[in-house]
Swiss-Prot record:
It is found in: Cytoplasm. NCBIfam families: dapB (TIGR00036). NAD(+) binds at E30, G74, T75, T76, A99, A100, N101, F102. Keywords: Amino-acid biosynthesis, Cytoplasm, Diaminopimelate biosynthesis, Lysine biosynthesis, NAD, NADP, Oxidoreductase. The gene is dapB. It catalyses: (S)-2,3,4,5-tetrahydrodipicolinate + NAD(+) + H2O = (2S,4S)-4-hydroxy-2,3,4,5-tetrahydrodipicolinate + NADH + H(+); (S)-2,3,4,5-tetrahydrodipicolinate + NADP(+) + H2O = (2S,4S)-4-hydroxy-2,3,4,5-tetrahydrodipicolinate + NADPH + H(+). It comes from Chloroherpeton thalassium (strain ATCC 35110 / GB-78). GO terms for cellular component: cytosol. The keyword Iron does not apply. Pathway: Amino-acid biosynthesis; L-lysine biosynthesis via DAP pathway; (S)-tetrahydrodipicolinate from L-aspartate: step 4/4. It comes from the Bacteria. Pfam families: DapB_C (PF05173), DapB_N (PF01113). The keyword Phosphoprotein does not apply. This is 4-hydroxy-tetrahydrodipicolinate reductase. Catalyzes the conversion of 4-hydroxy-tetrahydrodipicolinate (HTPA) to tetrahydrodipicolinate.
Length: 252
């Protein structure tokens, strides 16, 4: 698979290292924010892997679609405009897969959290909140992964109807609000926790990234899935990829 990598920060470097060491993939372009982009930059690629920044992704969206290549998007922080992006992709008959986090471990974590929220739903005594920690260089807060965790909870727990990303200066958080808090500290790769509490006990579900390798490997595997059979058209999430993998008989 020939990969055009857009974004050469820490995550881009991790993806490049995985691709180069795989023995079966080739990096045909490594582009950063200083690069003047044109569709020619992607002409030799089978797939574009995009890991820049929210503003850069949205600015480059039309050009990426004009390149007529499947696009894997690891950038987060743009999900408020997700319906706009989806409409653009479908209008262009394009191919895009996005994820808040490509790590297999994190995606297992998402499903564990969803089930935990479903289990506590009948019991009014339980409350739930989300916290995350990342390095001080991370741009968006809360992280896209934390917000994905929050959406998993909301989809399974009717008592929570909205996400609150900061506490009010005065007053208290409402029972139907799900608090998602963020800490920026040193060089922490990423830690996400779900806190469940009742008058009798507490439950903590947590995922800690040891490095960026899991994310990078997952992004490559998602790209392989997206380009198979000449390329799949549509707007996909990591759930689409994983659901097909898990339902495939040869994977069981």
């Amino acid at each position: 698979m020939k990969i055009a990598l857009l974004g050469t920060g820490n995550m881009g470097k991790a993806i490049a290292n995985i691709a180069k060491s795989s023995g079966k993939h080739e990096l045909v372009a490594e582009l950063n924010a200083a690069t003047t982009l044109s569709t020619d930059a992607f002409k030799d690629a089978d797939v574009i892997v995009e890991v820049t920044a929210p503003d850069a992704f949205l600015t480059n969206l039309d050009l990426l679609l004009q390149a007529d290549r499947p696009i894997v998007v690891g950038t987060t922080g743009w999900y408020n405009g997700i319906e706009h992006v989806k409409a653009k992709v479908l209008e262009a008959n394009g191919s895009m897969l996005y994820a808040a986090n490509f790590s297999l471990g994190v995606n297992i974590f998402f499903r564990l959290v969803h089930e935990a929220a479903r289990f506590i739903a009948p019991f009014e005594d339980f409350d739930i909140a989300v916290s995350e920690q990342h390095h001080t260089g991370k741009i968006d807060a809360p992280s896209g992964t934390a917000l994905k965790v929050a959406r998993e909870i909301l989809s399974a727990l009717p008592s929570k109807t909205s996400i609150k990303t900061e506490l009010p200066a005065k007053g208290k958080i409402q029972r139907d609000e799900l608090l998602v808090s963020a800490i920026r500290l040193g060089s922490v790769f990423g830690q996400h926790s779900v806190h469940i509490d009742s008058s009798s006990d507490s439950i903590l579900i947590s995922h800690t990234a040891k490095n960026r390798q899991g994310f990078a490997q997952g992004a490559i595997e998602a790209a392989e899935w997206l380009v198979r059979d000449g390329g799949q058209k549509g707007f996909f999430s990591m759930d689409d990829f994983l659901n097909e993998i898990l339902s495939s008989p040869e994977k069981k």
